[in-house]
Amino acid sequence: MLLHHTIIDGRLYARGSSDNKGSLLSRYIAVDAYQKVLGKLPINIKFVAEGEEEIGSPHLMDFIRDNPEKIQSDGIIWEGGSKVVNGPLVVHMGVKGVTTFEIVCKEPKNHSNPVWRLIWALNSMKNADDYITVDHFDDSIAPLTEYERNFVLNNDYDEEAMKKMNGIDHFVRDLTGNALKEKLYTEPSMNIQGLYFREIDPVTGMPKSAAVKMDIRTVPNQEPEELMRQLRNHLDAHGFEDLEIIEGHSTLPYRGKPDSLLAKAVIKDVAEVYGMPADVHLMIPGSCGMARVVKATGIPIVHYGCMDDASRAHAPNESVDLDHYIKGAKLSVLVFQNFATMD
């Protein structure tokens, strides 16, 4: 799985070493170690290796629908996860959704510039304070339940570590404390992935068409189809009827709870392996196909892995700390043991 790698100062450098082949491999290692040292596994373990997560897992639900007997289980450990260097392991119970799309401006009339037209449209969709200004965009957002609010407000959030990891000196709107944590759980985000144009007109010196590729990280109750309808209505209402929206892939958001037997086993065993309590989150800003799997199967999911905040996932010099990696495999061994005896 990791064909070419380099080890420097206790870190293994290789593409996919942290996100997320490395975390998957650590669980294979845990199974192999358990069988060689302790013998027969105390539980049945199934592996599902799915290679389309980065494009929205378009065929995952087909596989689940066609193979219910292969999926049925008492719990799912989902792909990868992270920890703070010299800090706690992060355990996630859910994810934000993602909806991707393009907005295209084709050959505007009167020699107008399609790039500027897109910029003006984008300016109507989000303001300088990071609020999404698409009409009715947040109408359906599910507020935190009393349980979720208490959990979020009582949960530690290492702001300094997050600022250091992301190379910033403050958060958007200068948020801090509970307001910052609530934003993470209850606000969607809108991101520009790239803006491009095609074919410069030799007469006007302007591109003939332009497009912007975007994504929205969604929170519970936001549905991709409804968001695209709201965006279409917003553009039309602001004079951009000529702009075309091309929908891309999407995954749904899911806000879980740490109350399943699997979650309790993982959280307990993290403290034993790492010598400090797990940093538990109901959801993370990232996205994957977790929500659709939970909705289709009802199986509780826990998300942990072998990355840390120096791993540089999806980037050059991706790496994993070998000590953390070994502990991650040990954690899985303990989870196998303890989950088998919980009721």
Report residues per predicted region:
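A common structural junction motif
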Residues: 125-129, 232-241
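Active-site metal-coordination/substrate-binding segment of hydrolases
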Residues: 1-46, 327
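Short glycine/serine- and small hydrophobic-enriched flexible loop segments
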Residues: 29-36, 120-124, 216, 334-337
